[in-house]
Amino acid sequence: MRHRNSGVKLGRTSSHRKAMFENLANSLFEHELIKTTLPKAKELRRVAEPLITLAKNDTVANRRLAFARTRNAATVGKLFTVLGPRYKERNGGYLRVLKAGFRAGDAAPMAYVELVDREVNTSAE
């Protein structure tokens, strides 16, 4: 029985999976838009959205929790100075997962993951 077994293994050990989602979350917070496989994108929501919720309340304890989960001081700084205030009035749903076709090499379903209210660069050049 699989009662209370949540999460997807994605063919990786637990330490590899933890490191992979830590890196994906760091990339997402740095660039605000990343492209990855669809199963990874769906599972990334479970990692990234609680971090943004944590960043809405800027305390030392919350910063330490965020650092423990991301291991990146620059990411923690951006979470608490930019992203936390940006989503102060939004109750969840900070990420958008958009399907992006299939990868050429192995036909894996791909997806874009983006932050919902990100600033889009619309340069006329």
Curated annotation (Swiss-Prot):
Transmembrane segments: none annotated. The keyword Ribosomal protein applies. One of its GO terms (biological process) is translation. GO terms for molecular function: structural constituent of ribosome. The keyword Ribosomal protein applies. Keywords: Ribonucleoprotein, Ribosomal protein. Disulfide bonds: none annotated. Gene3D superfamilies: Ribosomal protein L17. Part of the 50S ribosomal subunit. Contacts protein L32. NCBIfam families: L17. Belongs to the bacterial ribosomal protein bL17 family. This is Large ribosomal subunit protein bL17. It comes from Acinetobacter baumannii (strain AB0057). The lineage of its organism: Bacteria, Pseudomonadati, Pseudomonadota, Gammaproteobacteria, Moraxellales.
